[in-house]
């Protein structure tokens, strides 16, 4: 299940809390065409703080940054520099060492470093071939990470026997702590990437994740497995969190739909393929440790491919590096990127990334969408343990043959991925009516795919429930996964989009809250699934979850008809009149 698609997304946006208490070096100086008004400012990055205090020009830029936040889509909310109007001084001078010839901004007195037309270093200007290469590599990494959460479910008995622990404990050690890590990591890695870029986070966290697969496979006691799987889950959450932002960096909005659909499918296909590969290793590998050794090889190979191919794509970081280089080469301290005007203390970062997500859970839209997505995520992980109960314990099948039964879920995900561009086209058609009138499209337009897809999940669950008798053909519970897989994937992106459009500047925090709660619930479900099936029976255990998912079908309809009214009572929801509160 995607964390990236949240998680995505989940980078902190620019808001009014980011800019305050900046120092007092600058007053309202008139701009001199040949003499720097920033002569007291050294070229060190931490001196950028003194650029903005009491400078009305910079304050206006910051205001534009705030208004431009939230324009890049469901998985990341950076500022859109194209929406920021600068005013070059008509008497500006140019530095010979500056190949881009940045002028002095008449309001701020800065040489504002941004992308120029046709800038070959702009990630959005790279060739289509490279864009698709990066997209496929990023999607493959996301698939491998998601695979790691479920491949261990193919063989639970042998490690439990080796460590001398119960079924519940081995599930806790191999699945639960890993998924908990998925929820914790984004709270740290998303804001960190805004400061240092995406590539360093990818390189370090993936290296840690690959290294800690080794002690999992070599573990001599259950404590080692628990600790190392938790570290792996936290480290592997970084690419799940940041990949959506990387795709937003390279694709323009109208082009991004297909790339995002591929990325969104990868985190679903990974867990679905996990039991397939895990079951084969269970039946044919000499020891359960080969599950980890196989995953180590796959993860290591894709880590190397990723490092070799995908560059840094974060626009703010690339422009910050350019500004720093120009300051050094020209000796002119006025070269500043927009990122350098956004200065936050540690306390502000902590408040934004750690506290605000939980505050936003008090919002009805965030709360109900979080509950809905958490239930769907839990259902996916429920299947990993319900299928062995139905097929291995009920029908006496092998682990590898049971794993094959997950294929229809994957087919449903693929169908949903193919359908995604058509849903997106329908949204753009409906939204254009509002844009032609100079209005923002209402967020509720994002809910139409959810209103269609929500019914597929309970249908698939009821079909699984009442075709899972031992004397009924294997095909019933198997092909019920087709509807469930389609529903899971089709619900996910519209839910993210609706939250983003409803909260704009606070969308990153809202998505982080959803990711955290969803991960905690997804981690807990495997702990009681087997007991639930044994006590309620295969039919009523699945039916219970089907009834819950059926009740959740009311959520998209509720917000489609009443969402606008709900937002009027919100402290944080975005409106064109009030911007962000």
UniProtKB/Swiss-Prot annotation:
Disruption phenotype: Leads to increased susceptibility to cycloheximide, 4-nitroquinoline-N-oxide, and 1,10-phenanthroline, but not to actinomycin D, fluconazole, ketoconazole and colchicine. Also leads to attenuated virulence in mice.
Molecular function per GO: transmembrane transporter activity
Record carries keyword Glycoprotein: yes
Superkingdom field: Eukaryota
Keywords: Cell membrane, Glycoprotein, Membrane, Transmembrane, Transmembrane helix, Transport, Virulence
Biased segments, Polar residues type: 1-14
PROSITE patterns: MFS
Region (Disordered), start-end ranges: 1-43
Glycosylation sites: 11, 125
Ranges that cross the membrane: 132-152, 169-189, 199-219, 230-250, 261-281, 290-310, 365-385, 403-423, 447-467, 471-491, 510-530, 544-564
Gene3D superfamilies tied to this protein: MFS general substrate transporter like domains
Membrane topology: Multi-pass membrane protein
Transmembrane recorded as keyword: yes
Comp. bias intervals (Basic and acidic residues): 15-27
InterPro entries associated with the record: MFS, MFS_dom, MFS_trans_sf
Regulation: induction: Expression is induced in presence of cycloheximide and 4-nitroquinoline-N-oxide. Expression is up-regulated during biofilm formation.
GO CC annotation terms, alphabetical: plasma membrane
CDD domains: MFS_Tpo1_MDR_like (cd17323)
GO biological process: hexose transmembrane transport; transmembrane transport
Subcellular location: Cell membrane
Record-stated family: Belongs to the major facilitator superfamily. DHA1 family. Polyamines/proton antiporter (TC 2.A.1.2.16) subfamily.
UniProt function note: MFS transporter involved in N-acetylglucosamine (GlcNAc) uptake. Confers resistance to cycloheximide, 4-nitroquinoline-N-oxide, and 1,10-phenanthroline, and contributes to virulence.
Protein name from the UniProt record: Major facilitator superfamily multidrug transporter NAG4
Organism: Candida albicans (strain SC5314 / ATCC MYA-2876) (Yeast)
Lineage, opening ranks: Eukaryota, Fungi, Dikarya, Ascomycota, Saccharomycotina
